[in-house]
């Protein structure tokens, strides 16, 4: 692994000292059109990440660290939701790889939580896709990567315009309809290892004032472990109506249904003998998602743009299974009967509206973005239901009453303003404020007899952010920013673990302060790079303290009591050596990339119930090095990519336990190196052939130790070597 990386670093360095012998091509043609990408690649071999424009009409991203991933330029395995390949050029992004279905996204940066991407503000086409960004920001829905045109990433400084979370924004951008485009579409069929079967069909058409795109994907498989089969159906429909030259109405509807069998976690001993064994045969997960959205975009001139969107989410998830730890076997009793299973069920209903407007005045010297957001989210949670003792998925209960029944509501109003002022043609200052108003409420039953009532928690506060950008040329930028963000109080924070525990009446949202300083740019058509350093301070982290009441009885008191910090380096660079040496080649183009994330994430102060303080301990699931490198070769209609990914070891618990427990729930997560190969071949105008081999060396590895019944206690292994092939036809 390190030899491969060293070779790539040497190649980059060798080419960097040769720049003076090449030509720098700069397009000086002025344009008033707002672009969605910064870099135009031309005919070079570079296929990697770009960054977002400073101002796109309603969003102001000047001086922020941003990335743009264009999936159509990738050879990656999209049908199998290969997060490791799709985010391969994104430095420092940690991917949890234990879900063969690919339904849930579990990614993080800078030592933050990987739990279903909790610390990212997850969106699709600019609107929420999580149940409640304020109280339950878990990504149980992920759009099919075969739908996604590009992925926008804005790190911590996105908080001013998007609110929570600490990690920043991830926005999946799906295909847009095109006006005056004749009827057409595409079909893709994928088969792969472990019974993978994916079918995609898409239609599109456009008239003068009306255009639409509609697609459906079915994906299923047996999974790479026993008892891990899955299936999903996702549908997406969008229609654009242009009743006037300056305005477009948009309606979008997304529907998803997914079911997966959960093979459970395994012990340390089991992993050493057979990494892909299963302990559970009767555990299941099910989710349903429905998201209607209405938008209106108004652009009367290049100076002023506005957008309003009204959105809703009606969704839910259920978990069914045998919930004991993995050292307790799920076997029938002497009478031949299995134990009853437990059923947990959530239903989410949320809706809201956002208004954004942008002003681009004085020949782009003054750019302003303002916005308003209103939101209401409701979660109805039922837990510990006594289900049947069967082996198939069923939500039928032996006792129709759930012992635990809870209802949580969040109401949110926010407003922001952000401005960028060009002091000179090369230097720009940016800054802004965001106001948040949040009301959290909850009630229900902790068990059949214990009433739970959470007091109304009303809070309001202001976040600030500043930044600066210096562009000595159109191909080079030095940028920096400092911004505040927050992780809202979650519904689980408001829920005591027992009837005797107490939650602080003055519990606050956790706060963060993020700093970025970097340099990014390009050299002609043969080099692109983005190098930065960061510091992230995270305060008011929520935890439990052991207390005693007036009767000397012990109880847990949940309050704000801890802080942590992360600092590191993020580097992405990609070059085309053939363009450097020859400008072009009759034998094709080569693109070499390297992505480096170096991260030191530690607790600064965090007292525990035992009296211990976690000061100096490493944060959980926060590897200190994430290194990826790869090579893409393109010749006419053929392209292939080989990628190597190294992830260093990390700890699964805050105490930094090295020696694993027998069940595998706690202990060191060893580092690992994985290789992926993929190719694309386009035949004539209509046919497409893609293939991939993931985990080429068939490495046994894992990225997570489970500490709960779902998806399972113990080690949750990653996928072994797997192969897939896709045939597509466009009409």
Segment roles from a protein language model:
Residues 143-186, 581-584, 730:
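A beta-strand signature from Gram-negative outer-membrane beta-barrel systems
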Residues 425, 533-537, 555-655, 697, ...:
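Gram-negative outer-membrane beta-barrel transporters
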């Amino acid at each position: 692994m390190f030899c491969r990386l060293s070779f790539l670093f040497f190649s980059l360095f060798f080419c960097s000292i040769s720049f003076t012998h090449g030509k720098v091509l700069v397009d000086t043609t002025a344009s008033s059109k707002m672009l969605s990408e910064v870099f135009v690649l031309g005919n070079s071999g570079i296929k990697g990440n770009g960054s977002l424009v400073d101002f796109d009409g309603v969003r102001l991203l000047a001086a922020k660290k941003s990335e743009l991933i264009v999936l159509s330029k990738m050879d990656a395995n999209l049908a199998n939701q290969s997060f490791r390949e799709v985010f391969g050029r994104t430095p420092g992004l940690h991917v949890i790889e234990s879900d063969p279905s690919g339904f849930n996204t579990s990614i993080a940066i800078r030592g933050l939580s990987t739990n279903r991407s909790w610390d990212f503000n997850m969106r699709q086409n600019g609107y929420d896709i999580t149940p409640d960004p304020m109280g339950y920001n878990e990504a149980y829905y992920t759009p099919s990567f075969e739908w996604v045109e590009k992925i926008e990433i804005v790190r911590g400084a996105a908080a001013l315009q998007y609110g929570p979370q600490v990690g920043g924004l991830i926005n999946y951008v799906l295909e847009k309809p095109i006006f005056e485009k004749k009827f057409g579409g595409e079909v893709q069929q994928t088969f792969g290892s472990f019974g993978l079967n994916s079918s995609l069909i898409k239609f599109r058409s456009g008239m003068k004032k009306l255009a639409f795109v509609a697609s459906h994907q079915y994906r299923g498989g047996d999974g790479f472990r026993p008892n891990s089969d899955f299936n999903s159906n996702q549908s997406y429909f969008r229609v654009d109506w242009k009743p006037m030259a300056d305005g477009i109405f948009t309606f979008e509807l997304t529907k998803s249904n997914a079911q997966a069998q959960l093979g459970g976690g395994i012990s340390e001993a089991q992993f050493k003998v057979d990494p892909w064994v299963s302990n559970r045969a009767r555990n299941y997960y099910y989710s349903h998602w429905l998201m209607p959205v209405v938008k209106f975009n108004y652009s009367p001139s290049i100076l002023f743009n506005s957008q309003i969107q009204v959105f809703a989410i009606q969704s839910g998830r259920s978990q069914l299974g045998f919930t004991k730890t993995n050292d307790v076997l799920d076997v029938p009793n002497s009478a031949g009967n299995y134990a009853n299973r437990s059923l947990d069920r959530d239903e989410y209903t949320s809706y809201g509206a956002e208004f954004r407007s942008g002003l681009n005045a004085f020949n782009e010297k003054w750019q302003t973005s303002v916005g308003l957001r209103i939101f209401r989210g409701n979660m109805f949670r039922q837990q510990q239901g006594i289900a049947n003792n069967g082996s198939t998925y069923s939500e039928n209960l032996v006792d129709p009453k759930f012992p635990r029944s809870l209802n949580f509501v969040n109401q949110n109003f926010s407003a922001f303003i952000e401005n960028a002022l060009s002091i000179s043609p090369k230097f720009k200052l940016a800054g802004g404020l965001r106001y948040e108003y949040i009301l959290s409420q909850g009630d229900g039953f902790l068990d059949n007899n214990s009433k739970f009532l959470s007091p109304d928690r009303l809070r309001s506060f202001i976040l600030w952010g500043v930044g600066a950008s210096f562009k000595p040329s159109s191909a080079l930028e030095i940028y920096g920013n400092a911004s505040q963000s927050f992780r809202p109080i979650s519904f689980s924070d408001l829920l005591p673990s027992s009837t005797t525990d107490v939650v602080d009446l003055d519990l606050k949202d956790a706060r963060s302060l993020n700093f970025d300083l970097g340099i990014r740019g390009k050299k002609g058509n043969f080099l692109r790079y983005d190098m930065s350093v960061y510091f992230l301070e995270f305060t008011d982290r929520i935890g439990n303290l052991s207390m005693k009441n007036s009767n000397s009885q012990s109880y847990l008191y949940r309050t704000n009591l801890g802080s942590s910090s992360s600092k590191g380096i993020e580097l992405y660079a990609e070059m085309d050596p053939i363009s450097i040496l020859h400008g072009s080649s009759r034998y094709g183009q080569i693109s070499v990339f390297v992505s480096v994330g170096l991260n030191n994430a530690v607790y600064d102060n965090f007292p525990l119930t035992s009296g211990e303080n976690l000061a100096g301990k490493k944060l959980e699931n926060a590897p200190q090095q994430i290194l990826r490198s790869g090579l893409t070769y393109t010749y006419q209609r053929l392209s292939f990519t080989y990628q190597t990914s190294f992830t260093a070891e990390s700890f699964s618990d805050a105490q930094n336990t090295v020696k694993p427990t027998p069940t595998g729930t706690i202990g060191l997560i060893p580092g690992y190196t994985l290789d992926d190969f993929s190719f694309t071949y386009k035949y004539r105008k209509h046919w497409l052939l893609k293939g991939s081999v993931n985990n080429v060396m068939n490495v046994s590895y894992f990225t997570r130790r489970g500490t709960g019944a779902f998806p399972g206690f113990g080690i949750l292994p990653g996928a072994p070597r797997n192969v897939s092939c896709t045939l597509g036809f466009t009409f």
